[in-house]
Amino acid sequence: MLIFFFFFFFFKYIYNIFILTCFYITLSSYYFIISFIFSTLMFFYFCTFYVISLFFLYISSFCKSIKVTQLYDKKIKIKSFINNYLVSCRKKKYIYNNVDDKSNIGTFNLYHNIRDNNNNNNNNDNNNNLKKRDDVLFPLCNKNIINDVQKIYDEVNNIKDKEQKINYLMEQCSSLCKENYFPPILNLNKAYRNKRIDEFNKGNKNFYINEVGKNIWYKYVNRCDEILFMAIDIQIDEDEQRNNSIKDVHDVHDDNIKTCTLIKDDKHFEKYKDIHNDNILKNILPLDKKIDSIKNMLNHKYMKKKKCIITIDAYSNNLILYCFLYLILKHINKMYLYSFMNIQIKEITAKLKELFDLHFNVHHIIDYIHEYIYNFLMSYHIKRKKNKSKNMKEKDIKNVFANNIIISDEENKHISKESSDMYKKKTTITTTTTTKKKKNTMKLFTYPRIAHMLSGGVDSLMALHLLERKKFYVDNYFFNFTNADCSKNDIKYVKDICKNNKRNLFIININDEYFDEVLVPMLFFYADGKVPNPDIMCNQKIKYNFFLKVIKSIYKQKWNYRTKSKLCNYDFISTGHYAMIRTNDKNNPNNIFNNNLFIKKKKKKIKNIKNKKNIKNKNNIKNKNNNNNIYTYNIYNLHNDNIKTNYKKNNKYFYKLLVSNDKKKDQTFFLSSFNHIQLSKFIFPLSLYTKKDVKKYMNENNINNYNHKETKGLCLFGNIDMQTLLHKYFVNTEKDDIKNKQNEDNIFKENNILNLNNNFNQNEKKKKKEKKLLVDITTTSSHLKKFRETFIPKMNLHYKNYLINLDDQTILDINSDIHLYAIGQHKNVTNYLHNLYNKKMININGYKKKHVKNVISSFQWIVVYKKIKRDMSTNLIHNFIYLTKNYDQDLFTHIRTKCKLHNIKWIEGKLPACIKKQFKKYNKINKKKKKINNNNNKYKTNETFHVYNNIQESGKKKKKKKVKNIPHDEKTIFVKIRNSEQIKKAKIKFSLSNNTAYLKVKQKDTGFSPGQIITLYFPFIIKKNNKVTYITNLNKYNNLINTNKNTIYYHCLGSATISNQFLDYNLYQHIKNIHQINDLNMSK
């Protein structure tokens, strides 16, 4: 370069002289002198430049030969002129490389032709020519990470808004988001390899951030607050893939498998880890000890001769976490493992997390990486020891364990003697054991996908807020029933709720399904004279069966990648019901909302029960002559084994339905028809909340976009008069109304009967104050036609109604209208009779007098009993309805306290344990009775019979009192007959036939109508030892003197339907006399 400058200026000087001579010829001497001066100045300028260039050349040769020596320390920085020179050299593709390790003194030289440090693959991938270990080099090799973090830290500190910080983070990874961000693997229950990435990626890229080996698994990382998959590739001896001798490391933070398993056979390895005489070594060591143990393993002699390179790749469906990981992991690509362990990654990630104000559990991610490295190196050590120590003695094995090669705790060196048997086994046995365990290694704690039933009210909205707090993936579903006005109002609120917060919403039209599954069966029940419960039918058939079908079809459409349709159903269904589920499944989200209210099963009692069954079967054969004993034993065996159920047996987990914290708004009455398998799919977030708490939360947070009116009446219909709805569907045309009038005129009698025409129903429509129906003929014309064409011909609606007064023994009215009342009902009957006698009141002179008080129109009439008789000859249905004004008489005590049950459905699928225990007590009492009677009968004679009975009565009064309190054929149970009522105590007596029983309530009820559903409960208490004790005496625990203050929970056992009422003999005779007086035959 200097020679070039020399020749350039030399020729230029000659050229200038040549020009001057030319001018000398033409011009005068004055101009010649000026040009000569200018050329001399140029010559001096050339000389100075040449001297300066020689000086710099001398200095550069001096810098190449010099060696800089200084003591090694992390905190000491290299001098400023060397650092500045490094920056200039990096542009020319130079780098610090070779280091000689001599008493911690570093000698630094410069090398040519090495890859630039600014690339991503800059981290020690190029050190193929090294012969010695570069333990001193790690601060310089990892300097790019520190510099990048410092830049980010300085730039983000100036930003104050959180949104701007996140935008900055996204800008740093803008190219990554476009290329690498694609949907996750749906089957989270399994790990996947990088071959699976091609299925979801448009390009041919087989990695997310850094490229990993082909056989490396992407495994799920638990407890990170987001879905995160991570792949860690550790290579030894410059191999591209992992050695085949080293097997996959166990998953970190798994509950079933211990994370510190160093030998593949876990059963034998547990015996080597006895600490503090009883305690086993914990699954997760402290992080400081774990890092020290990794460094100690890397400092072994045979490890210093080898290269250990690490690359980390990760993926998350959360884009913010994905970009955050990219900033940290982009430099960890084929990095030396020793230098990686000396980087303080935990401190770096903690600072970045505080900068960006993120909520992710970053500490747990780094613990996962360190634990994976720890397990990998331990397995590598053991694999190496196995090859050397096949015939090792017990003493040598103890020394291996004590020298901190396998167990890193120096204080605890108590190791058992059972050692060599583990190493003598074949490798095939170890592989089979590990493969079996790998099926259950992945225990996922991901946020579940939930299908939430959003109705537009307060309760469902509060449940949605609680689910979103826990970061569940929620999709909202609304059941749209266009025939009801309440659903039209609710859909407005539902749309506002989902629009404001950008929530998912699916609207399901259920007009046809509700008509076929709920409305038609309900009308058939009423036609047979029974009183159904459409709310329970709606929960079972629409909100569960039909809803599951809809969910599957929607999810197929939603997750349809390319041509492959992958079905991934929702994990749970959530509702706004006030109920609680108790389960021992720790992964069930119901434990989050009920404060982990689960109890462990007892294993000891199961064995005793099996032995007792065999003993009792033998006793049944011996005691055939005693009828009382046969009766009790047959019931016990019948309910233990012979009940037919369609439920699958699941011995691991149980799911029990409990009453919620708000006992007034409790809705377990509507959920009692579900079995335990169906309950396992439900979540009830409002289990511990009351209605006051919900409204208080809404007021404090200023949430008003919900329907403030409470839903009452029929399910999805709202407030509706049942009698008017029955008239709409059962009364066909106007001709039928005329026929009803003619039949009533023929039935008319002068004695104790007043004529009533069906014009009453038509005149009511003209009133202004009349309540409007929610169901109109215009909106449901198709359903009405379908019902009249297909279902009415199957029904027999030819009624002849008798309204009978039990107090005066008279008949109030006979008609052929539809009077299908429930027992205990008073509103519709009294309105009917008041309007009848006010409108049709006839004076003696023939003039009508309206609104005249009389005996009938001034009282409230209540339905006490009803009976339906079918006349096969005339095809008429005689409907006898018995009414009274005084419902609190002693004559009606039995009919208000007793009934017969059938179709008993237990939630567990078998007789509950709280009732089984009562059978055992009664059997013990009966056995004692037998022994006493058998011993006494030996010495009885005709002479001493009377004397013996007197002695027996006087001497055994105490034992008789105990037997009277607990009769052998009755069991205590608690009952709720209607949703709005409280839980009552009752006695139940099971019959010999299957699924039938007799019920007796202590307190008087409003009435038991056939077809009505009753829910069965039993209270219990949880003691300090987490043991459940079922109780029968509530006064003991509700008392103010109680010091324990145990809360009483109610366990919902199941449901049953009322088949008929219990008629007392006195009431039967009273009804019989009325029929004889009025010439009404009971045989009709």
From Swiss-Prot:
GO cellular component entries: apicoplast; membrane
The UniProt catalytic activity note for this protein reads: S-sulfanyl-L-cysteinyl-[protein] + uridine(34) in tRNA + AH2 + ATP = 2-thiouridine(34) in tRNA + L-cysteinyl-[protein] + A + AMP + diphosphate + H(+)
Sample GO molecular function, one term: tRNA-uridine 2-sulfurtransferase activity
Which spans are transmembrane here?
1-21, 32-52, 309-329
What Enzyme Commission number(s) appear in the record? Answer: 2.8.1.13
Q: Name one GO biological process term.
A: tRNA processing
* Free-text function comment from the UniProt entry: Catalyzes the 2-thiolation of uridine at the wobble position (U34) of tRNA, leading to the formation of s(2)U34. Required for apicoplast maintenance.
The UniProt similarity line reads: Belongs to the MnmA/TRMU family.
* PANTHER family to which the protein is assigned, alphabetical: PTHR43052, TRNA-5-TAURINOMETHYLURIDINE 2-SULFURTRANSFERASE (PTHR43052:SF1)
The identity of this protein, by name, is: Putative tRNA-specific 2-thiouridylase
Q: Which organism is it from?
A: Plasmodium falciparum (isolate 3D7)
